[in-house]
Amino acid sequence: MPRYRLTIEYDGRPYNGFQAQASQPSVQGAIEAAVKAFTGQTIRIAAAGRTDTGVHATAQVVHVDLERDWPAETVMNALNAHLVREAISVLDAVVVSDDWHARFSANERRYLYRILNRRAPPALERGKVWHVKKPIDADAMQTAAQALVGLHDFTTFRDMACQAKSPLKTLDVARVSRVGDEVHLVFEARSFLHRQVRSMTGTLAEVGVGRWTADDVMAALEARDRTACGPVAPADGLYLTGVGYEGEG
């Protein structure tokens, strides 16, 4: 039974998150329905990450096991044909070994958060950015973000419903930069806690608008207390932009 690695792009707005749910539209459910329409198989896909409602992806990675040995390009084209009415696209399909796993073989996940920082609201990007009217100091955010890099107890930035056994995570990259009218936050780590990225983003935004200092961010991290977190940024501006695997650049 050949295993296929699929790279997926999607707009998270129409879906109640990635994970399949019986009575709500989901990214996983749409992809699995497309596989069934193509092959007749009822399957479960595995994903590198399960994004929340409204969160987008430019390079989510999933794998699927098919009964027939189809050419990878045929799989990609067929799934896209069945996903044409969905806000989902298969960007690439590759045959991988049976022991390769989209989630457990991953050693890095990359997220981008987009803040639109101008007075005028978004007309074309509504639901795809967080609109913040007050001027943001991206340099101050970048300085404060460095306190989060490294191995830490991220209890402060962990959702109360998070099911991870440990709050310890190693954040490899936290980078903030201004790109025109937008402020971009990039985070890279092997894995993240539930809503960790949005919690860090909302907290750093408090620094950007002058309500918090870098020392406040450090104090919040060291408090190991969810109530010490700043506001949680909305899902709108968050994108899963890449998943890294050993041996890949």
From Swiss-Prot:
Chain positions recorded as substrate binding sites: 111
Signal peptide region: none
UniProt-listed InterPro entries: PsdUridine_synth_cat_dom_sf (IPR020103), PsdUridine_synth_TruA (IPR001406), PsdUridine_synth_TruA_a/b_dom (IPR020097), PsdUridine_synth_TruA_C (IPR020095), TruA/RsuA/RluB/E/F_N (IPR020094)
GO molecular function: RNA binding; tRNA pseudouridine(38-40) synthase activity
Biological classification of the source: Bacteria, Pseudomonadati, Pseudomonadota, Alphaproteobacteria, Caulobacterales
Bilayer-spanning residue ranges: none
Name of the protein this chain belongs to: tRNA pseudouridine synthase A
Function: Formation of pseudouridine at positions 38, 39 and 40 in the anticodon stem and loop of transfer RNAs.
Pfam families membership: PseudoU_synth_1
Record has tRNA processing as a keyword: yes
EC numbers, comma separated: 5.4.99.12
Stored Gene3D superfamilies: Pseudouridine synthase I, catalytic domain, C-terminal subdomain (3.30.70.660), Pseudouridine synthase I, catalytic domain, N-terminal subdomain (3.30.70.580)
Family affiliation: Belongs to the tRNA pseudouridine synthase TruA family.
Disulfide bridge partners, by residue number: none
NCBIfam families in UniProt: hisT_truA
Active site: 52 (nucleophile)
Gene source species: Caulobacter sp. (strain K31)
A single GO BP: tRNA pseudouridine synthesis
Catalysis performed (reactions): uridine(38/39/40) in tRNA = pseudouridine(38/39/40) in tRNA
Quaternary structure, from the entry: Homodimer.
HAMAP family: TruA
Keywords, ordered alphabetically: Isomerase, tRNA processing
